[in-house]
Amino acid sequence: MEKKYNIRIERAADTSALSSFRCGIKSMDDFILDKENGLDKFIQLRLSNLWIVRENETPVAFFALSKDALMLNSEDRRNIEHKEQNASILPSNGDADKFWDKEKYPAIEIDYLAVCKEKRDNPNDHMGTYIIEEICRMAEADIFSSTMFLTVEALDTKEYSAVDFYRNCDFEFSDVAQNKYNYESMFGNQPTTRRMYKLIIPIK
């Protein structure tokens, strides 16, 4: 990504900085503005940490993160191992089976991510992708706990779908989540999100 951004990312204790923020997706904007049952309540209950992205002091994006645990199956393992860029960072020989024997893997979940409408409407602006890269760097710098994956419940509705955006950022559907999605869809309960993951940290 060639564009450079002059931005500042800072923790926020509440959503007061987002009072004039609009991403242009009605359901998300309503959620941001809803003080009783929306994003602010989610942050106040400490279910997620909110980060504001400022450009020239103006909030142009935000994201909220929490800890997660990612479940993977044998099909997920094959998909991850077959990616050429993962060959040099995954464990090999005797360590591989030990690594893949885990029931779940440490992750950080992107609970929410939104970019202001002005930037979303500009096809040459890739602020969302830049933020994903910044989140990866933040996770890699975390000295308190291991983080190997980013996860997200990508919004996927008739109004808006974030699935293609996350695919372009190298997120994939987990086979475990895909099986659940197919089951719910088959019985008429169409999910509004799709669980996806991204391998982010080399294993040393």
Residue positions per predicted region:
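Non-catalytic substrate-recognition and accessory regions of acyl/acetyltransferase enzymes
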Residues: M1-N122, Y130, E134-E153, T157-K204
